Regions:
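Short loop/turn motifs at secondary-structure junctions
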Residues: 25-27, 47, 63, 140-143
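Beta-loop-alpha module in the N-terminal Rossmann-like domain of NAD(P)-dependent dehydrogenases
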Residues: 46-109
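Well-formed, non-transmembrane alpha-helical positions, independent of function
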Residues: 19-22, 41-42, 57, 82, ...
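N-terminal Rossmann-like dinucleotide-binding module
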Residues: 1-46
Length: 145
């Protein structure tokens, strides 16, 4: 059973937690929110025992093996790096980072700490995305006339 935490208490986090619960392989053990009241409200719905308003405290906790990051996009990279550097597996909502340099740094940090880094980017798995990939290319761009 993988013990995981969530950063963010929004609708997408709720969907992720419900899907993870259905798999029977994951247990939500910690919730982070800037507001203790928000964390408590979310935690009550899922019987979670560990609440955090400090990311550093959560990263240093022995209550989690992985974290699901669903915070505002601008925070994703810094939060990802924090947890990877504490040897905690990371599932991060898209976008993982704001540029290729940050993505490369996150990948390097995951490798260095021997943990999994996963960007939740479902669009690449959708049929219409595969159709776009199958279209002929013209130079470095696709053209539609």
């Amino acid at each position: 059973m993988i013990r995981f935490a969530v950063i963010g208490t929004n609708w997408i986090t709720r969907q992720f937690v419900e899907a993870a619960h259905e798999s029977g392989k994951y247990k939500l053990t910690a919730v982070y929110s800037r507001s203790l009241e928000q964390a408590q409200h979310f935690a009550n719905d899922f019987s979670v025992e560990h609440l955090f308003t400090s990311l550093e405290a959560m990263a240093e906790s022995d209550a989690i093996d992985a974290v699901y990051i669903a915070s505002p996009n601008a925070l994703h990279f810094a939060q990802t790096q924090l947890f990877l550097s504490h040897k905690i597996h990371v599932i991060c909502e898209k976008p993982l980072a704001s540029n290729v340099t940050e993505v490369d740094a996150a990948i390097a940090c995951a490798r260095e700490n021997q943990v999994v880094l996963f960007e939740a980017f479902k669009t690449a798995s959708l049929p219409n995305f595969h159709l776009l990939r199958s279209l002929p290319t013209f130079g470095s761009a696709w053209r539609n006339k």
